[in-house]
């Protein structure tokens, strides 16, 4: 039994030994193949390097040969030039001698005569040179100015989105359209009357279009409508409540936008009311260009150019940011936006330098500081950039604003809204000023005024609304 176990163990040992030897041979064979492969690759690489070196050597030999040939040619040309120089000297001396004999002048006398003529010529050339230097200086100044402006524009890569006159509000389903319209249209009429915005409800799936030229009113209408949709309760009283909430929310947005603008431009220490007015510029457009984004861009451009020219970048940025501040209220106060802006800056204690730099950007006043010139230039650059402004939208908005101004100039008008793309104006009058009979005559008077003062296609509907409310509380 012990012998059998021993024999089995010997056999197993022999088998294991053979397996180990076989694995070792395979590993050796594998390593040998890998070594040969690496050796071949290295030999190939060395051959490639050797070929490249040989090619470079041949190239250098050719270049060396070419340089030697050029050197020989230059040496020959130099010798030829030296020979010709000697010949020219001989000819020159002979010609001088002949000229002295023919003219009866010595070389000294001829030299003095020549110097006199040369002096006149040099004076003329000097005058021309001064003129050329002046022209070159102007060209260099123009070039430097273009470089500074280009650098400022490249550093200030502001994005602009062309503003439109419509906003789309998404609905959860098309059934919501009926609830927004309300029984006999009372909900939609209430919302349009309170906001001054047209609600266009058509076949567009799950969407209502808000149309109006005043972006602030449109934003109030959007927020109010979205709140009503989310709340689910849509009736005139709830609409009034949501419109009031939306107005407060928009006021908060104005403040946040103004603060963000001062943060983005690095302009600090502004009066809170100026910050709020800056926020209002987010909802103002000039030829389709967002006025707040335009003001931020002007601030950046003016600051960058001031830095390049060694002027005061903080002053330039501050004046650039505030240069259109008058546009935040120019439809509420009489005067140009520059006059209004100057009055606002004086009211809120801005420095004379800031007011001056802001006041000159349309050429109403002569710029007296480099910062004022830079604000004017930055304003022109921002406005002139291709695609920044659209004339047709601006003229359309101005026509609607003029339509509202006609109504607002009458006493007893609480507010007015130009809607339906200017085809209708809704005028809400104070009930204590006009009675029910008088509003018909008032509507007729407004109609005649519009016909006299405005040019418009088609016809304009004048809708005068008089509303009386009696409120008591049961205790």
Swiss-Prot record:
<dbReference type="GO" id="GO:0006402">
    <property type="term" value="P:mRNA catabolic process"/>
</dbReference>
<dbReference type="InterPro" id="IPR006675">
    <property type="entry name" value="HDIG_dom"/>
</dbReference>
<keyword id="KW-0255">Endonuclease</keyword>
<dbReference type="InterPro" id="IPR017705">
    <property type="entry name" value="Ribonuclease_Y"/>
</dbReference>
<comment type="similarity">
    <text>Belongs to the RNase Y family.</text>
</comment>
<feature type="region of interest" description="Disordered">
    <location>
        <begin position="34"/>
        <end position="73"/>
    </location>
</feature>
<dbReference type="InterPro" id="IPR004087">
    <property type="entry name" value="KH_dom"/>
</dbReference>
<dbReference type="GO" id="GO:0003723">
    <property type="term" value="F:RNA binding"/>
</dbReference>
<dbReference type="InterPro" id="IPR022711">
    <property type="entry name" value="RNase_Y_N"/>
</dbReference>
<dbReference type="GO" id="GO:0005886">
    <property type="term" value="C:plasma membrane"/>
</dbReference>
<dbReference type="Pfam" id="PF00013">
    <property type="entry name" value="KH_1"/>
</dbReference>
<comment type="function">
    <text>Endoribonuclease that initiates mRNA decay.</text>
</comment>
<dbReference type="GO" id="GO:0004521">
    <property type="term" value="F:RNA endonuclease activity"/>
</dbReference>
<feature type="domain" description="KH">
    <location>
        <begin position="165"/>
        <end position="228"/>
    </location>
</feature>
<dbReference type="InterPro" id="IPR004088">
    <property type="entry name" value="KH_dom_type_1"/>
</dbReference>
<dbReference type="InterPro" id="IPR003607">
    <property type="entry name" value="HD/PDEase_dom"/>
</dbReference>
<dbReference type="InterPro" id="IPR036612">
    <property type="entry name" value="KH_dom_type_1_sf"/>
</dbReference>
<dbReference type="Pfam" id="PF01966">
    <property type="entry name" value="HD"/>
</dbReference>
<dbReference type="InterPro" id="IPR006674">
    <property type="entry name" value="HD_domain"/>
</dbReference>
<feature type="domain" description="HD">
    <location>
        <begin position="291"/>
        <end position="384"/>
    </location>
</feature>
<protein>
    <recommendedName>
        <fullName>Ribonuclease Y</fullName>
        <ecNumber>3.1.-.-</ecNumber>
    </recommendedName>
</protein>
<keyword id="KW-0540">Nuclease</keyword>
<keyword id="KW-0694">RNA-binding</keyword>
<keyword id="KW-0378">Hydrolase</keyword>
<dbReference type="Pfam" id="PF12072">
    <property type="entry name" value="RNase_Y_N"/>
</dbReference>
